[in-house]
Structure formats: structure tokens, C-alpha cells
Amino acid sequence: MATRTVETSDSRQTEALGAELAAALSPGDVVLVQGELGAGKTTLVRGAARALGVTDPVTSPTFSIGHRYRGRDVTVSHLDLYRLAGLHEEEPELLEDYLGPDRIAFVEWPEQRSPELRDARLLVTLTHQGGEHRRIEVCERERLPGDASLELSG
């Protein structure tokens, strides 16, 4: 697995990193986004969604569990599993609605450990460093030859 660590000093930089990550994603990809409350998870997803052509407001799905947004060429799913023990336990149909081969999914609070998330493309961990500063670690799982890959050296 390739890993990259980035330091950001404001929300614009965090959104820019999300946009950079989005450029390497394809329909069917799942990105796990973890970090404490207020770490910038939704900010990162907002940047990715904008880069994928989403024009609607991108907000935290904490109270609704998930949002779907229409991008230029792909639907973007944004799930928050904070209140769920697992996708199948609460609402099994969420898998079909939010995780599918025709969409890109971002899943906040993946610590809830749903087995359906084991094939996720990326794990992104955000950590507060004081003020607006964040340390963001991006871990890419192995890809097959010919798949788009991120430049994670640095």
C-alpha cells in the first residue's frame, strides 16, 4: 500500500486535497474518511465532490446517514456511519442506494466496520494539529495494473 501524508493550514487546502484525490477515482470506488468530530472530513469530501462536478451544497450527512449528489459523469454518495453499528444491521438497502459500481462513495466514520467496506480504494485519516491545521494521511490499497493510481510519494 502507498501512503502519503499532507499538512493543510485551512479549509481551502483541505478541499484542494479532496479535489486532487477525486481526479484519480472511478465509479465503484469507495473512500473511507476517518477523524474526530470537526477534523475536516466533510470539507475533504466537499472538495472531491466539487471536482467531480457536484454543484449542490455538500453537507455532513450525520443526521440523515447519507446524501447522494449528481456530478458531471457520476453520482457521488456521502455516508456517515457514526450512529450505525453496521450497514446491514440498520438499513440493508443503504448498500444498494449508496455503494454501487456506478457511483463514487465517501464513507465517514468507517470505524463502524461494515464488511461491505473492506474493498475500499482509499483510507483517509484527518487529525487536528491546532487551529485550522490538519494532518491528513492518505493510504491507497493495491490496484490492478492499468488502473488509475494516485501519486502518493511525498
Task: Label each PLM-derived region with a short phrase.
Residues K41:
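Conserved lysine of the Walker
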Residues V31-V33:
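Hydrophobic anchor at the beta1->P-loop junction of P-loop NTPases
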Residues V54-Y69:
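Short beta-strand-centered segment that lines the nucleotide-binding/catalytic pocket of NTP-utilizing
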Residues E36:
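P-loop (Walker A) phosphate-binding loop of NTP-binding proteins
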Residues A23-P27:
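Phosphate-binding P-loop
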